[in-house]
């Protein structure tokens, strides 16, 4: 099983990153994709991936929250980092019109620029979309023919949005959000509609600790070692064997991010 979304650069892991990776391995997690969300954290993610060769890889990009930082120098840094062997996708990039920490115009500019970098380098994109689906799809679609793959990280949308993502060929990342009985029920009902070869799994650690995890960790911090729990729950709600689902989603991740 492969965790495609871990924020291992987070300060929440500052005291015990090595142990977090060890616990993930002990839990049966076969690989981790470390998320880059701005130039500085993308560089940190790259260094962490290099510290765990053949187990950790990373993305390089600028999250929509940080899109106001986007300029030529940042673009050059992302382009340069993308040439590292351990950097396997451009992102986390996209649109987030929920909080608008950067203006919609700044977000669209940074998103389009990162899609152009990914197309130039023929790299997959690691995508973020929140409360921006129509504009997200309209900006992304013209680039899809030039991209080897596009992954919607932490998908939490509705059936119409899922169908639209699948229709243009996107791969869907599912987190422990689906384990939340308060806000994950709609997403849970959509799980059987995601083709197995288009499904990826992720913790988004240290965020989104599964609410149905027992016993709950005292820290309330999510970790990649909890990925098996998420996979078991997804498999149950899809009517599939958990071991098989862990294997197929692992194969999907390795194919999409070209880790073979």
Curated annotation (Swiss-Prot):
A divalent metal cation binds at residues 92, 128, 153. Gene3D superfamilies: Metal-dependent hydrolases. It comes from the Bacteria. One of its GO terms (cellular component) is cytosol. GO terms for molecular function: 3'-5'-RNA exonuclease activity; magnesium ion binding; single-stranded DNA 3'-5' DNA exonuclease activity. Its EC number is 3.1.11.-, 3.1.13.-. It is found in: Cytoplasm. Disulfide bonds: none annotated. Monomer. Belongs to the metallo-dependent hydrolases superfamily. TatD-type hydrolase family. TatD subfamily. This is 3'-5' ssDNA/RNA exonuclease TatD. 3'-5' exonuclease that prefers single-stranded DNA and RNA. May play a role in the H(2)O(2)-induced DNA damage repair. Transmembrane segments: none annotated. Pfam families: TatD_DNase (PF01026). Its cofactor is Mg(2+). The keyword Transcription regulation does not apply. Keywords: Cytoplasm, Exonuclease, Hydrolase, Magnesium, Metal-binding, Nuclease. InterPro entries: DNase_TatD-rel_CS (IPR018228), Exonuc_TatD (IPR024918), Metal_Hydrolase (IPR032466), TatD-like (IPR001130).
């Amino acid at each position: 099983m492969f965790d495609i979304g871990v924020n291992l650069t987070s300060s929440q892991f500052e005291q015990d990153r090595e142990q977090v990776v060890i616990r993930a391995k002990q839990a049966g997690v076969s690989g981790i994709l470390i998320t880059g969300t701005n130039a500085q954290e993308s560089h940190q993610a790259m260094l962490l991936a290099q510290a765990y060769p053949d187990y950790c890889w990373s993305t390089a990009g600028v999250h929509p929250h940080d899109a106001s930082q986007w300029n030529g120098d940042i673009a050059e840094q992302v382009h340069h980092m993308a040439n590292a062997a351990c950097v396997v996708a451009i992102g986390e990039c996209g649109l987030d019109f929920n909080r608008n920490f950067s203006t919609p115009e700044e977000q669209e500019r940074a998103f389009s620029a990162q899609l152009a970098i990914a197309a130039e380098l023929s790299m997959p994109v690691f995508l973020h979309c929140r409360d921006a689906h129509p504009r997200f799809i309209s900006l992304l679609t013209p680039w899809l023919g030039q991209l080897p793959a596009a992954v919607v990280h932490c998908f939490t949308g509705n059936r119409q949005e899922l169908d639209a993502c699948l229709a243009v060929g996107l791969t869907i990342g599912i987190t422990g959000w689906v384990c939340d009985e308060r806000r994950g029920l709609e997403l849970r009902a959509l799980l059987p509609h995601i083709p197995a070869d288009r499904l990826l799994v992720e913790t988004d650690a240290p965020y989104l600790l599964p609410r149905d995890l027992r016993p709950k960790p005292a820290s309330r911090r999510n970790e990649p070692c909890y990925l098996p729990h998420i996979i078991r729950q997804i498999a149950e709600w899809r009517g599939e064997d958990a071991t098989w689902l862990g294997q197929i989603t692992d194969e999907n991740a390795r194919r999409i991010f070209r880790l073979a």
